[in-house]
Amino acid sequence: MAMIFCSTLFSSPPLLSPLTSTQTKPSRFSKKLRARAQCQSMEDHIHDDLLRRKFMEFPYVSATRKQLMVDLISTVEDRFQPLLLPCSLPPDVRNFKNPNGSAEASIYIRSGEKSSPIDFFIGSWVHGKIPTGVTLNITTISAFLKSSTKAPNFTLEVIQSSPTSLVLILDLPHRTDLVLNPDYLKEYYQDTNLDSYRQSFLKLPGVKPYVSPSLFVRCVVSPAASVLKIDVEEEEQLEEIWRDHVGPAAKEILGVWFERCAREEDDEKRAMGEEERMELERRDKSF
């Protein structure tokens, strides 16, 4: 295709009479360029769709967990579709394996248009064995807002180390100091009753709080975050908790994020000084 394009580009154009208008109708050359551009755009779209399908397979987790991840990603895309740019990561970054095939990962990132409240959202899955011999399967969905708002982001991360054990992080991480901004705490956590999900989880058998060994993780999650260790005896028990409790809660919390956080705010509420905005951007980039 490249050779044909070069041949067309450097071939001699037909001679025109001085009285001939070059703008009466498109030349054969411009039609070919337009056709090639359309074909390339179609090829890019097909290729992007194939890579997206590959990502959406979530091949190393249960069907129940896969369905929730697919549902959440599709919901975000459907909600903001006109305001999201296509994923621009190279194919070898979007899906890759190590040389011996013992580890595989896939990443999917879409940035927001200029008018979108979303800066970007990311989905990923990672499968691999660690030196201790444990096989880890990590799935993540996170959505990050622009610095035009201080509203919380959304995150769901699941770290599974066996068929009957996993760590769950489900949260709307805050983006400002909650002690200095009690109204923020009230609006996004108290008024939304976000802590009720964590409390409900802790009533289930096999579910207990998880304390991350990372001080960084412990300071960035909100007071209402569901940071939990689920450890049960049977695989079916884990599937039941995921299907009947984690899935519905994740969808409801994403709905809260849509309605309370990922929306256009009025100018008065959105107004921030330049120093405050720069501080927010610096904080966001640290993640």
Name every feature range the model reports, one short phrase each.
Residues K31-N100:
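Charged, compositionally biased non-catalytic regions
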Residues M3, D71-S74, D78, P82-Y189, ...:
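Phosphate/adenylate-binding glycine loop and adjacent helical scaffold
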Residues I169-D284:
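Mixed-charge (acidic/basic) macromolecular-recognition segments
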Residues E43, H47, V61-L68, L72, ...:
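Non-membrane alpha-helical secondary structure
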Residues M1-S41:
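N-terminal chloroplast transit peptides
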